[in-house]
């Protein structure tokens, strides 16, 4: 199913943040994955940086755990979804 992305960077970041919050609140996801999602969320909320830099920092935090063998498949799909959304954020 195709997802319609918001046209503006802040809309994309808010969409990514909402997906990250669902991962953080899911107790079926291992703690290290939730911690990485929380770290990515912190990067996205940093007002001192431009949207593209915030997105790049969050992607970096998520890519470290995206191949974790203990991650449930649905969580991996959500992580990849967030990365895909954030890759479209440009300054």
Curated annotation (Swiss-Prot):
Q: Which Pfam families match?
A: UPF0147 (PF03685)
Q: Which residue ranges run through the membrane?
A: none
InterPro entries per the UniProt record, alphabetical: Ta0600-like_sf, UPF0147
The family assignment reads: Belongs to the UPF0147 family.
Q: What name has this protein been given in UniProt?
A: UPF0147 protein APE_2336a
